[in-house]
């Protein structure tokens, strides 16, 4: 068994698509748009076959995105090396994304950094 995909709602679906394509190498399918409900989605496929569905609907409401809450906490991307973690973190910082933890080795031995995407979702970048 494997997880087929993870889905998340976003406010700006095109900006979210561009973010994952530019920084994480995702490939996006064509935009799906249900004109009856105004639901929109992209499936983003990553190099290892993992998929993320980003979705939008006009009547969505904001959720308080504190660092700790019940439910999903973050999405983690393995980029292959410490150097790539460092380089991507610098690129994201220069592009204006908030770095919530600089590259470091955690107590359980992971080398990672954490950033917030354009909508405040936590993204972990690891080896």
What are these regions, as identified by a protein language model?
Residues 29-31, 54, 59-64:
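A short, acidic/glycine-rich surface segment
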Residues 36, 46, 67-69, 105:
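A generic structural micro-feature
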Residues 38, 71, 109:
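Exposed loop/turn and edge beta-strand positions of beta-sandwich/beta-sheet ligand-binding modules
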Residues 31, 43, 89-127:
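Vicinal oxygen chelate
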